[in-house]
């Protein structure tokens, strides 16, 4: 299955331990560990939920993925948006992407925990609320849903970015979710 992955630094493969913020080696990144799938990685450091699907529509038309995997929202929360506003923005984005004719798997990011980048209890609470908002949104939009908070994804010292073991756990969880999507798509 051809899979378009739209996400932030955790999709890109950002390694916060590196001095210049480089990527993990390909063998570590979850996008490179999805066996049996052709993966188009559109992860970008710092990406928040786009206001429209516009930047991805031509890519969807030209590459014809079977499924778009979307995991965004953490940067919105880090920039001060709440879970409700983030989910509303995601709703608009998903409407555009789905109108292009691609099926979508919406993934709730792992909830944040207190650490170097996460100093606020409110931020932690909003990341938990986002999981429920995305679950409801996926039901309303008729797209697939997965909660990465259920996959045992280990985060590094900043409590935002995946560790190498976190990438492996995410790949395992996503592989299972993709099998379920394939079964339903037919």
Where are these regions (language model features)?
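General structural signal for secondary-structure boundaries
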Residues: 33, 47-48, 82, 100
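Glycine-centered flexibility sites
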Residues: 7, 13, 43-46, 73, ...
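Serine-esterase "nucleophile elbow" of acetyl-processing enzymes
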Residues: 1-43, 57-64
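Structural motif
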Residues: 46-55
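Alpha-helical cap/lid subdomain in secreted, periplasmic
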Residues: 54-186
């Amino acid at each position: 299955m051809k899979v378009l992955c739209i996400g932030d630094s955790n999709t890109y493969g950002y390694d916060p331990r590196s001095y210049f913020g480089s990527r993990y080696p390909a063998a570590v990144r979850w996008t490179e560990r999805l066996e049996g799938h052709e993966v188009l990685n559109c992860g970008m450091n710092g990406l928040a939920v786009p206001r429209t699907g516009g930047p991805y529509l031509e890519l969807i038309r030209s590459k014809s993925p079977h499924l778009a995997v979307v995991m965004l929202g953490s940067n919105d929360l880090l920039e001060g948006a709440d879970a409700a506003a983030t989910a509303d923005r995601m709703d608009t984005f998903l409407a555009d992407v789905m109108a292009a004719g691609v099926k979508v798997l919406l993934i709730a990011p792992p909830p944040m925990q207190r650490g170097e980048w996460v100093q606020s209890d409110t931020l932690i609470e909003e990341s938990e609320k986002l999981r429920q908002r995305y679950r409801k949104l996926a039901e309303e939009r008729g797209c697939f849903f997965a909660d990465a908070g259920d996959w045992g994804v280990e985060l590094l010292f900043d409590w935002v970015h995946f560790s190498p073991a976190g990438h492996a756990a995410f790949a395992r969880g996503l592989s299972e979710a993709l099998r379920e999507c394939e079964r339903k798509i037919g």
